[in-house]
UniProtKB/Swiss-Prot annotation:
Biological processes per GO annotation: cellular response to fatty acid; chromatin remodeling; negative regulation of cell differentiation; nervous system development; nucleosome disassembly; positive regulation of cell differentiation; positive regulation of cell population proliferation; positive regulation of double-strand break repair
InterPro entries tied to this protein: SMARCD1_SWIB_dom, SWIB_domain, SWIB_MDM2_dom_sf, SWIB_MDM2_domain
Region ranges (Disordered): 1-103
Residues modified to Asymmetric dimethylarginine: 68, 88
GO cellular component: brahma complex; chromatin; GBAF complex; intracellular membrane-bounded organelle; kinetochore; nBAF complex; npBAF complex; nuclear matrix
Keyword Acetylation appears in the UniProt entry: yes
Annotated keywords: Acetylation, Chromatin regulator, Coiled coil, Disease variant, Intellectual disability, Isopeptide bond, Methylation, Neurogenesis, Nucleus, Phosphoprotein, Ubl conjugation
Linked residues for Glycyl lysine isopeptide (Lys-Gly) (interchain with G-Cter in SUMO2): 101
Keyword Phosphoprotein: yes
Stated name of the protein: SWI/SNF-related matrix-associated actin-dependent regulator of chromatin subfamily D member 1
Region described as Interaction with SMARCC1 and SMARCC2: spans on this chain: 168-474
């Protein structure tokens, strides 16, 4: 530090200090005449800077005798201690050691921000590689191979579970339906007429018709499905119409209709009550609520594809299968279909595009037919068979779909796995720290002296990095450092640049005065 102060005290001097590189400074006598050379000695405790080219002082070009030059620019001193430039004065940028450059403050800030982001990212996302034990630990502890085997098994298990989850997600995109039997019960009761002698008023004879139903229990259902809430009877239908005998109830009162709306509340059955004391023939029309919607095919297309009622995607898929089986695709223009005699009769065209098929199918698809049940409402008190049962096929959501959804949405197991993974990462990190401590102590035990020297060198490098010190202060404080080949060229370039700068300033000043 004393040597550093000595250089800084010499650098800011004027003309005498600037020529210190020649080995001596010329003292100016009265009138500006050069006096005898005066040797500048170092301050107490300071080292003396000696130039590699000793010689007498020489006048600077472009300066009058006796004049003094004021210092310009940064102070001159040893590299790394004087001024702010990141390179030595007069030394080309390419000749500077890249490792000795001081990074700009903006670059340092960017590097620090990037490091913080990387640490946060690594803290949030643990990699599979963090669970792997280093090879050195596996050599020291042979029993750790069992852990590596478990890790490989876990990797395979994770891959299998992930593949299964993807399969389930793809399956949920398609409608998963299963066919069940819906049993419909149609019953009626008769209330005979009653007379009231007291007030002369009585009740007329009437009957009541009930339409209800339920799903038949399937022996293959699980306990989960058995305890599940039962669907209401009306949820299976889009509309229900009961048509009574028009001759008995007239054209305005012979129809009883129910249609589903957005605000419809589901019910377990329907009942109709009308006056009457004779048997009534009625027709029950039930329109199933298909989800997704299904359509009835044109009879010609139904015979060709072997489908009576189906969803639109299934119909298009069946038609494409027919085209592919009979090789009806145009070999030259693949977007066209060459219709055979059956397709020509149905679509009334010899050639059509694939993109036209959905539009052409629209005219061939009709609403599905309703379920028609004919029933006789009996008012005979001796008739014991007043309840009729009918079984129809309905499509309900597969119970497996609910289990699939619950499997995908369940997070309890994921949280438990994440907790165990964190424990594994902490354990592996502790093992790595213990391994580092073991290697540290083992190296010290083998060669204490060499280990201490290497450790001090490493700590010195870390200290320089932490304190942002550029260069090697231990070398730069010695005079031999400045007897290297670069010093002479650096000094000459520095003086030349200062002279050129001063000359330009003088020329500008003289030019202003002349004008």
């Amino acid at each position: 530090m004393a040597a550093r102060a000595g250089f800084q005290s010499v650098a800011p001097s004027g003309g005498a200090g600037a020529s210190g590189g020649a080995g001596a400074a010329a003292a100016l006598g009265p009138g500006g005449t050069p006096g005898p050379p005066v040797r500048m000695g170092p301050a107490p405790g300071q080292g003396l800077y000696r130039s590699p080219m000793p010689g007498a002082a020489y006048p600077r070009p472009g300066m009058l005798p006796g004049s003094r030059m004021t210092p310009q620019g940064p102070s001159m001193g040893p590299p790394g201690y004087g001024g702010n430039p990141s390179v030595r004065p007069g030394l080309a940028q390419s000749g500077m050691d890249q490792s000795r450059k001081r990074p700009a403050p903006q670059q340092i800030q960017q590097v620090q921000q990037q490091a913080v982001q990387n640490r946060n990212h690594n803290a949030k996302k643990k990699k599979m590689a963090d669970k792997i034990l280093p090879q050195r630990i596996r050599e020291l502890v042979p029993e750790s191979q069992a852990y590596m085997d478990l890790l490989a098994f876990e990797r395979k298990l994770d891959q299998t579970i992930m593949r299964k989850r993807l399969d389930i997600q793809e399956a949920l995109k398609r409608p998963i339906k299963q066919k069940r039997k819906l049993r419909i019960f149609i019953s009626n009761t008769f209330n005979p007429a009653k007379s009231d002698a007291e007030d002369g008023e009585g009740t007329v004879a009437s009957w009541e018709l009930r339409v209800e139903g339920r799903l038949l229990e399937d022996s293959a259902l699980s306990k989960y499905d058995a305890t599940k809430q039962k669907r209401k009877f009306s949820s299976f239908f889009k509309s229900l119409v009961i048509e009574l005998d028009k001759d008995l109830y007239g054209p305005d009162n012979h129809l009883v209709e129910w249609h589903r709306t957005a605000t419809t509340q589901e019910t377990d059955g329907f009942q109709v009550k009308r006056p009457g004391d004779v048997n009534v023939r009625c027709t029950v029309l039930l329109m199933l609520d298909y989800q997704p919607p299904q359509f009835k095919l044109d009879p010609r297309l139904a015979r060709l594809l072997g489908i009576h009622t189906q969803t639109r995607p299934v119909i298009i898929q069946a038609l494409w299968q027919y085209i592919k089986t009979h090789k009806l695709q145009d070999p030259h223009e693949r977007e066209f279909v060459i219709c055979d005699k059956y397709l020509q009769q149905i679509f009334e065209s010899q050639r059509m595009k694939f993109s036209e098929i959905p539009q052409r199918l629209h005219a061939l698809l009709m609403p599905p037919e309703p379920i028609i049940i004919n029933h006789v409402i009996s008012v005979d008190p001796n008739d014991q068979k007043k309840t009729a049962c009918y079984d129809i096929d309905v499509e309900v959501d597969d119970t497996l779909k609910t289990q699939m959804n619950s499997f995908l949405l369940s997070t309890a197991s994921q949280q438990e796995i994440a907790t165990l993974d964190n424990k594994i990462h902490e354990t592996i990190e502790t093992i790595n720290q213990l391994k580092t401590q073991r290697e540290f102590m083992l190296s010290f035990a083998r060669d204490p002296q060499g280990f201490i020297n290497d450790w001090l060198q490493s700590q010195c490098r870390d200290l320089k990095t932490m304190t942002d010190v550029v260069g090697n202060p231990e070398e730069e404080r010695r005079a031999e450092f400045y007897f290297q080949p670069w010093a002479q060229e650096a000094v000459c370039r520095y003086f030349y640049s200062k002279v050129q700068q001063r000359r330009q300033e003088l020329e500008q000043a003289l030019g202003i005065r002349n004008t």
